[in-house]
């Protein structure tokens, strides 16, 4: 019996380590995603109806902002590479980022040694060569490799006559050669992998409302374990392709939406009714069901969280207030999110965001959206559903949401 227990323990430890590693990767993806609001604002200011010919008529100013925003949206792979390397490595510093950049630059240039189609020089219009483009996935992989190798070798000491290359100076050199290997690998095998991702995207799109619902439900379901960024990265930065006005091919629902693809926004629109209306209503329901002596304090807190969710789309403070103490409410929330995604898809609503599905992004990207006005009535309906269902479940099952904790827990928190 002890042997079985001893065998099970290491297996459990290995599984736990893998899970924690995946969580860490998911958290590291948040750093590069944080630059998107800046990109979105600059691209918006560069549109014709703001600083351009249909707005203030400052064409040069519009071009400056448009190019500035395009520099960020067009460089997402290397931004993900740097962000993941810094976010994943323990005690990362500038040498971690340098190693990631060196590896990525080599990797991306090596890809050009494997053209999918050759360049054609002809009278009238030359056709440029096309290359395999793993996009942000390649950047993430290079960032992870840089973080792991930096962690392993940044204190490595070589023989005396190579002492100049000890430690942090060694890792960028290693990453240069790793970039060659990864570039050759993707150059040889990316085409079927890319086709598989494209086919998966077409399959998800082909499911119609069901595909949007599946994504929305999985997105919310993975938040408690911190792994939702994996599915977000695939859907928002990898699926689909669109050629923008500059002739560059961009990938992913967010990037395509910001580039003006009218078919994009299907994996984002359904979050607006939830984040702007549904969750704020849930917060109000929790405040109204708090014990009378705690209702005022909880109401003040929940109004603040609801305003944050509505304006910015930051929902974690509300979600974590009931996620673990009342899991049934979180399951309900995930299901309602899936339904919202399905409804917006079914009604032909296309909307997107730079950061999250709050009012700022809703207003900022109105001009790029299709039927954005429908989000308001849909959201009001979901607000009513969230309030009624949350209030009913909290009272019916005596759920210990904020303000309903046992008295002794409140006293302990006060003493702490």
From Swiss-Prot:
One Gene Ontology cellular component: plasma membrane
Chief subcellular location: membrane
Residue intervals passing through the bilayer: 68-88, 96-116, 130-150, 170-190, 196-216, 266-286, 298-318, 323-343, 344-364, 375-395
Membrane topology: Multi-pass membrane protein
UniProt keyword list: Cell membrane, Membrane, Phosphotransferase system, Sugar transport, Transmembrane, Transmembrane helix, Transport
Induction: Induced by GlcNAc. Transcriptionally activated by AtrA. Expression is repressed by DasR in the absence of glucosamine 6-P (GlcN6P).
Role according to the record: The phosphoenolpyruvate-dependent sugar phosphotransferase system (sugar PTS), a major carbohydrate active transport system, catalyzes the phosphorylation of incoming sugar substrates concomitantly with their translocation across the cell membrane. This system is involved in N-acetylglucosamine (GlcNAc) transport. High-affinity permease, which exhibits a narrow specificity for GlcNAc. Essential for C-signaling between vegetative growth and development.
PANTHER family: CYTOCHROME C-TYPE SYNTHESIS PROTEIN AND PTS TRANSMEMBRANE COMPONENT, PTS SYSTEM N-ACETYLGLUCOSAMINE-SPECIFIC EIICBA COMPONENT
Entry protein name: PTS system N-acetylglucosamine-specific EIIC component
């Amino acid at each position: 019996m002890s042997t079985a227990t001893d065998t099970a323990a290491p297996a459990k430890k290995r599984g736990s380590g893998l899970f924690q590693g995946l969580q860490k990767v998911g958290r590291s993806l948040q750093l590069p995603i944080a630059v998107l609001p800046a990109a979105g604002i600059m691209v918006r200011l560069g549109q014709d109806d703001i600083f351009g010919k249909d707005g203030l008529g400052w064409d040069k100013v519009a071009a400056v902002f448009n190019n500035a925003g395009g520099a960020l949206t067009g460089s997402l792979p290397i931004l993900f590479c740097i962000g993941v390397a810094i976010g994943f490595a323990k005690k990362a510093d500038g040498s971690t980022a340098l190693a990631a950049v060196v590896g990525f630059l080599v990797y991306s240039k090596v890809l050009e040694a494997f053209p999918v189609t050759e360049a054609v020089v002809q009278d009238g219009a030359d056709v440029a060569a096309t290359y395999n483009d793993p996009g942000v996935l390649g950047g993430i992989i290079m960032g992870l490799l840089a973080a792991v190798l930096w962690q392993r070798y940044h204190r490595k000491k070589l023989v005396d006559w190579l002492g100049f290359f000890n430690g942090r100076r060694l890792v960028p050199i290693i990453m240069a050669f790793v970039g060659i290997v990864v570039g050759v690998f993707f150059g040889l095998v990316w085409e079927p992998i890319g086709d598989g991702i494209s086919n998966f995207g077409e399959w998800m799109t082909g499911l119609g409302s069901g595909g949007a619902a599946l994504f929305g439900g999985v997105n919310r379901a993975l938040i408690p374990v911190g792994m939702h960024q994996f599915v977000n990265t695939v859907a928002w930065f990898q699926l689909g392709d669109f050629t923008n006005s500059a002739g560059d091919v961009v990938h992913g629902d967010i990037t395509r939406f910001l580039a003006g693809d009218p078919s994009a926004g299907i994996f984002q629109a359904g979050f607006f009714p939830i984040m702007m209306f549904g969750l704020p209503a849930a917060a109000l329901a929790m405040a109204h069901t708090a014990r009378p002596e705690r209702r005022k304090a909880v109401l003040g807190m929940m109004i603040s969280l609801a305003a944050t969710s509505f304006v910015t789309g930051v929902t974690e403070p509300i979600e974590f207030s009931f996620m673990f103490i009342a899991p049934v409410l979180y399951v309900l929330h995930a299901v309602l999110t899936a339904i919202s995604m399905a409804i917006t898809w079914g009604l032909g609503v296309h909307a997107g965001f730079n950061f999250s599905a709050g009012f700022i992004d809703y207003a900022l990207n109105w001009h790029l959206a299709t039927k954005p006005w429908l989000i308001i009535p849909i959201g009001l309906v979901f607000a009513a559903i969230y309030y009624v269902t949350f209030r009913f479940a909290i009272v019916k099952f005596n759920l210990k949401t904020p303000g309903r904790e046992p008295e002794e827990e409140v006293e302990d928190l006060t003493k702490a």
